[in-house]
A protein has these predicted regions:
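Alpha-helical "hinge/linker" immediately C-terminal to small N-terminal DNA-binding modules
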Residues: 12-40
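A short LG(V/I)-centered, amphipathic sequence patch enriched
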Residues: 1-13
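C-terminal effector-binding regulatory domain of bacterial HTH transcription factors
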Residues: 22, 75, 199-203, 207, ...
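Secondary-structure junction motif
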Residues: 144-163
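Central regulatory/effector-binding core of bacterial HTH transcription factors
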Residues: 47-108, 258-265
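Flexible hinge/capping segments at coil-to-helix
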Residues: 107-119, 123-146
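Short beta-strand-to-loop elements that line the ligand-binding cleft
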Residues: 77-82, 147, 168-179, 217
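A ligand-binding cleft/hinge motif common to bilobed small-molecule-binding domains
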Residues: 184-209
């Protein structure tokens, strides 16, 4: 039976070849499913787990949890990749990725929400003593902002007024940086107001090094997801990693001063 159609310039599958290829893919899926069931039956997590994640968020929040998981399961070989680009899980061979914000539609990927980022507007106490504390979003125009840039563009702040109205504020400043840690360091040094995720500033806030602003206003949150390639049989090592992150990640990202929860409209 002829499976390939060859010419001097190209090669393609015949109808029989395409049918054979599809059957082979199904057979491989059945084998993977059988392996997954064997793993589940033994309750042993083993094999290599490749996870992609954003650099700072991954380093501070995700990596410590996954390392603990690997220590609990000696048969698990953990490989973590830190990058702020959107990796191609299929082409680059990752088992799963952690992604922040809105996800693009995909026919080949599955997602599960792990938790939410809570964004915090904050500044150093010395800066606020010197310049006063803003009382509303409109007041921010009178203050120095420390901007986050991506691809040369200043990203706007998504804020909430006290009545829950969503506001998009584009800060104007001579301080523009494409690294969140550098922005946090500049805020700690008293150079202005910064809009940062709470997991990055929680310790500094509780130690009194940064002061959260607009605490009584509803806060803005962004979803965090785990994504993986769609498959009828998810390997046990991937499923256990996702379940662990769902259970433990929200506490890592929390901030303990009370506020209502509201998403931007």
């Amino acid at each position: 039976v002829r499976l390939f159609q060859r010419t001097t310039r190209s090669q393609s599958l015949t109808d029989n070849g395409a049918l054979f290829y599809e059957r082979c893919l199904r057979a491989l899926e059945e084998i993977r499913g059988a392996e997954s069931q064997l793993e589940t039956g033994k309750h042993q997590v083993s094999g290599r787990l490749r996870v992609a994640m954003p650099v700072l968020f991954g380093r501070q929040c995700i990596a410590p949890l996954l390392i603990e998981l690997a220590q609990e399961h000696p048969g698990l070989e953990l490989e973590m990749s830190f990058s702020d680009r959107i990796v191609d899980l299929v082409e680059e061979g990752f088992d799963m990725a952690v992604r922040n914000g809105t996800l693009a539609d995909s026919a080949v990927l599955v997602a599960r929400r792990l938790g939410v980022h809570r964004m915090v507007l904050c500044a150093a106490p010395d800066y606020l003593i010197k310049n006063g504390q803003p009382q509303s979003v409109d007041d921010l125009r009178q203050y120095t902002a420390i901007n986050y840039t991506r691809a040369g563009r200043v990203l706007p702040w998504q804020l909430m007024d006290y009545d829950g109205t969503s506001r998009t504020f584009i800060p104007r400043s001579s301080l523009n940086m494409d690294d969140l840690q550098a922005i946090c360091d500049a805020a700690l040094a008293g150079h202005g107001i910064a809009w940062l995720p709470c997991w990055m500033v929680i310790k500094e806030i509780h130690q009194g090094n940064l002061v959260p602003l607009f605490k009584q206003a509803p806060d803005v949150r962004f979803d965090v997801h785990a994504v993986w390639q769609q498959t009828p049989h998810l390997p046990l090592r991937v499923r256990i990693a996702i379940d662990m992150l769902v259970k433990r990640l929200p506490a890592v990202m929390s901030l303990e001063f009370p506020a209502s929860i509201k998403k931007p409209r």
